Amino acid sequence: MNDVSKASLPKAIFLMGPTASGKTALAIELRKVLPVELISVDSALIYRGMDIGTAKPSADELKAAPHRLLNIRDPSQAYSAADFRRDALAQMAEITAAGRIPLLVGGTMLYFKALLEGLSPLPSADPEVRSRIEQQAAELGWELLHQQLQEIDPVAAARIHPNDPQRLSRALEVFFISGKTLTELTQTSGDALPYQVHQFAIAPASRELLHQRIELRFHQMLASGFEAEVRALFARGDLHTDLPSIRCVGYRQMWSYIEGEISYDEMVYRGVCATRQLAKRQMTWLRGWEGVRWLDSENPDRARKEVLQVVGAIAD
């Protein structure tokens, strides 16, 4: 698409960044001065009843700056990148039709990628094939199935841990159904996003600062009642650690503590470590991201001004 035809497309803003970088605070400030509506791009914030451990915006913040695609699933339900793309496109169309600009804010980079580039033509899940894989796993163990994936698709096997049955099963299922590897298929993109997108990433200037922010926020969550929140989920009886919701960072570690598998101190240590690892993965995505403008989260006023310099003209 050439620059002229791109300029005729409706506008959108992406505000990306690692966890604890100040994305939400900046988005709320931007909404005060720009004709934008916020759409959450976060695979944890979609869940109801998971507020403290996901650092969900407070009731006051949401009143001042409503976020779409928040609290749209029960923790027992799945939500895919395809689900997100469908829902986000519908919300973006609605916002644009009202004469405003969609501002998509979050840290789930897979969702941003799916929205921007479209989805690979992966086959739909097949219960029969999935059942056969699970039966094999029960007989032989997931470790052996991971070795099988290494032979079929070494790139996917390097990315998927043997203790991640959901993703391991899906990679094998895709091959058994289509005859093509997950790596082959994910290199084929779908429909590109029909918007002129201005992309920003916010993060502290140093890794040490980000680590400090992560540790501080985890302790703030604990002080705000995170344990009670997870105990309420645990008490339901229908949730478990194979679900994406309970595998969210912080929740998985607190779950292990509640089950008596680890001590409280170990839970805190693992929770902070897991959050840092998540931030590292997010930063790896962002460093390879094309067309992104970087903002310093340690200087929020300057970050806001930089966005306004770029976006102010398109918002007039």
Curated annotation (Swiss-Prot):
Gene: miaA
GO biological process, one term: tRNA modification
GO molecular function: ATP binding; tRNA dimethylallyltransferase activity
UniProt-annotated binding residues for ATP: 17-24
Quaternary organization: Monomer.
Name of the protein in its database record: tRNA dimethylallyltransferase
Chain positions recorded as substrate binding sites: 19-24
Keyword Membrane set for record: no
Superkingdom as given in the UniProt entry: Bacteria
